[in-house]
From Swiss-Prot:
Post-translational modification: N-glycosylated.
All ranges on the Cytoplasmic side of the membrane: 1-50, 521-687
Reactions listed under catalytic activity: chloride(in) = chloride(out); iodide(out) = iodide(in); nitrate(in) = nitrate(out); bromide(in) = bromide(out)
InterPro entries (UniProt xref): CBS_dom, CBS_dom_sf, Cl-channel_core, Cl_channel-K, Cl_channel_volt-gated, ClC
Record-given protein name: Chloride channel protein ClC-Kb
PANTHER family the record matches: CHLORIDE CHANNEL PROTEIN 2, CHLORIDE CHANNEL PROTEIN CLC-KB
Source species: Rattus norvegicus (Rat)
Gene expressing this chain: Clcnkb
TM helices/strands, residue ranges: 51-82, 91-111, 141-160, 161-180, 236-255, 282-310, 325-342, 400-420, 421-440, 500-520
Amino acid sequence: MEEIVGLREGSPRKPVPLQELWRPCPRIRRNIQGSLEWLKERLFRVGEDWYFLVALGVLMALISYAMNFAIGRVVRAHKWLYREIGDGHLLRYLSWTVYPVALLSFSSGFSQSITPSSGGSGIPEVKTILTGVILEDYLDIKNFGAKVVGLSCTLATGSTIFLGKLGPFVHLSVMIAAYLGRVRTKTVGEPENKTKEMELLAAGAAVGVATVFAAPISGVLFSIEVMSSHFSVWDYWRGFFAATCGAFMFHLLAVFNSEQETITSIYKTSFPVDIPFDLPEIFFFVALGAICGILSCGYNYCQRTSLFFLKSNGFTSKLLATSKPLYSALAAVVLASITYPPGVGRFMASRLSMSEYLETLFDNNSWALMTKNSSPPWSAEPDPQNLWLEWCHPQMTVFGTLVFFLVMKFWMLILATTIPIPAGYFLPIFVYGAAIGRLFGEVLSLAFPEGIVAGGKVSPIMPGAYALAGAAAFSGAVTHTLSTALLAFEVSGQIVHALPVLMAVLAANAICQSYQPSFYDGTIIVKKLPYLPWIRGRKIGSHLVTVGHFMNCTLTTLAKDMPLEEVIKVVISTDVTQYPLVETTESQVLVGIVKRTHLVQSLHTDSASWAPGQQPCLQDILANGCPTQPVTLQLSTETSLHETHNLFELLNLQLLFVTSRGRAVGSVSWVELKKAISTLTNPPAPK
């Protein structure tokens, strides 16, 4: 012992290896190490989660603001080039189209060359990961870099391609959360904990939404509604704390950079507070919600059908498999050509950015009444003080411009969602819903130019309020969420229309959820990601179907008295990840679970220790240290399909064994559950 420690016998200090003493400045190094250990002990006394959640929120706010800053500079450069290039139509057309074509081609090629999983929104994959499914490479740091660069190029195209950043930013936030989780595990020195990892990933999803819209409350609620069917209340404080840190930091950076005078909402509105709406208007808001619900059904169906067509069509599937940048360039040419301002783009306010779309649509003045007796000229450049004039063209009324915008953007947005680039799809549908509400409000303002009279008081029609309700209702119906109502309040700074907006969102969701899966669930279906379909309502009879009707009866068990040769045959002939352990071959009483990896490792380790002629059995392998797991949860043959589905969703399970009077008789996995639910919802035709 004296040759491996550097202290004399009886020394009061801790033993130190001689290797440490041979290094330079051993005493200083020990003092620094002791000070760091003391600081770590004091800091982590209140809980180490606080520090990592603060780091998560601050980091994502910095990344979000830096991206916005860089993208804003690039977009302004594009506008300057288009403005200064002259009056030649060919040069102006090329400056308008070549710019987004080059950016989208680079975004697609760069992100796909690094990792194919960086394309798309990322929310469907994150939703799958939070259910307990392991998706390789989706949370790697190289995916993070590809997503950041690709998303920046996508957003730099402006409103020409009409895409956002919410989905990819949620994916980026979850990647950072996963990385911080690994750092936390090494710092604290505790073993990996799957539960804590999922808690941090859930907080990361909330931070992603909060740092895009600077809306912490709706960010947490939206991430809960989109990402999970069951959510632990224990995770609430993590999500709210990290989201608040991120949103506050985002606002703080805007103030420090003189973009805002103080902390305010992103899209400022000025609705009157005295009488914001009257009771008869509730009916109109509900009707608007119903219209948004019907249109959202059509949008989700067309978008999902388009993705199916691209995958099944021979030409497009080959093009997407071999030349993704070429497909992106072709789609960008189509979209940029249509939005070219001197062309048909002048009838859809194509010179406005995504934020300017919302600022103008939320205007509380009625454009129809303001232009009723006059037709304002179409200026050569947008007027920053009167951006709403972009929606008014001498050759078309306000109603014609809004209708043309809705018709064209419907299929253009579907086309944009098929481009294999990192992009978000929530902000475009939010803007689209605002345009629906604006059109509805303008019609009402024309029908009731003096306002609605009720109880002797006059309540004027504010189209901006209907635009706010339409944005929340349409986006909520497309994503099957209710928190979009709160998101609309947070980004606009208005809550005077809380009741009518919420009723519109409820009406839209009631229609869309009855007939179509959500946008993200539809993408999961198209990409064939692992998922559990919802059991909607009691009419399908899920409470009457028991596990015995749909379980997998082919079950390979390992008995404790099974000879070693048979154990090896079972391992070689099967590829399952775990085996049910039974007491004896005859009784088949389930007593535990053996992981395949542990069993194979024990077989390799113990095979050399057996004497010639000895006939070992599985019990000997287990006695020599092969770990087993207790059966903490099992199903009965009489358990209903509804209860089984709830267990799998609540506990993020992948497989459960079925017993009858203690005997192992089968197993249930996602495959059996999905097949049983599909049989109930779409019963086979009678023979």
